[in-house]
Every structure is written in structure tokens, then in C-alpha cells.
Amino acid sequence: VYSMEHGKHVDIEVPAAMTLNEIWALINTSEKTRKHCMQLENCVYDFFELTTLNMAQQGLFGEILHVEGAYIHNLEEFWPYYWNNWRLDYNRAFRGDIYATHGMGPACQLLDIHRGDRMKTLVAMDTKAVTGPKLVKQYQKESAPDFQNGDHTMTFIRTETVSYTHLRAHETK
């Protein structure tokens, strides 16, 4: 927001915003200042993802009806280094996949999302929180019986043309 208000176009790495209010602040500021604001997703540029996209565009897989993506990341050694424990605090208060675009970006490319198809229905479920409360106790020295985000989140998205994608996220172990 600051950069757009000071005349700069902005590229943002994920997570660019964590709440709907933060998302609307980015959109409204971009529209008001007439500056571009683009969320980047580094996972669409990896060798495997680009190779798979190239193969799909050449028709090697036929009609694609189902894709899966994931962000399974063991962050155990990094928890003490997050600024003000933002990530642990977010997981304690909210449920869902913080980095959905890591799995969703490549899947959307394969399914031509916003290039002929679009997401229509989303269902997300998670396991109970086992690791999160242990991390709060270890790093914040308090109990967290109210810890919200489960250890593993599964998201299913159906598209307008009835293809679907399955995303998995696991980041607390």
C-alpha cells in the first residue's frame, strides 16, 4: 500500500494479504493510485511445474480432468525466527491454508483457470491441531487449547467445466 501511494508499481510475494480487509486495501489502493499490484507465485516457475505445463500444452496428457498440488513443508527449525511469531499467531487464531497458491498456481495453469475456465466451488477441511499447541507451549510458554488451524488442510475445488483440483497443505510439523 505504501509503495503504491508513493507512485510505485508493486509485485508481492505470498502471502500478500491475510484478511479480506487487507485484500481490499490492496485492490482499492491499486485502483485509486492507478498502480499495478501483482501477487507473485514462485512455485509456478519451478522446473517440474514448467515441464508439466509444457507437456500439457502439447496435449501429452489429453483432456485434464483432475490435478493435485501441495505445500508440505516442515518448518520446525524456522519457528523461532518468524517476526513477532506472526505465523504461529495466525495459525492459532485462524483455520485454512496460508500458502494455497503454492499448490493452486501450477494447478490453475494446467486447468486454464481465468483463460477459459474458472473456479466454481471450494470445500476445505483440516485435521485437528496437534502440533500447533505444542509449538505455542514451546515458543510462547503458554497453553493453547483454542488453537484453530489443524496440522493438515485439504482443499477441493471444482471448476466451471467440472474439472477439479485437490490441494494439500501441511506446515506445522
Segments predicted by a language model, with ranges:
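Aromatic/hydrophobic pocket-lining residues that form π-stacking "cages" and hydrophobic walls in ligand
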Residues: L26, T52, T165
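Short, small/polar residue-rich loop motifs at catalytic or cofactor-binding pockets
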Residues: D151
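Coil-to-beta-strand transition motifs
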Residues: F61-G62, T161-Y164
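Conserved small/polar residues in nucleotide/adenosyl-binding loops
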Residues: T165-K173
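Beta-strand-loop-alpha-helix segment that lines the small-molecule cofactor/substrate pocket
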Residues: V1-Y45, G59, K173
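Active-site beta-strand termini and strand-to-loop segments that position acidic
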Residues: T155-T161
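Predominantly a Rossmann-like dinucleotide-binding segment in NAD(P)-dependent oxidoreductases
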Residues: T33-H36, C43-F147
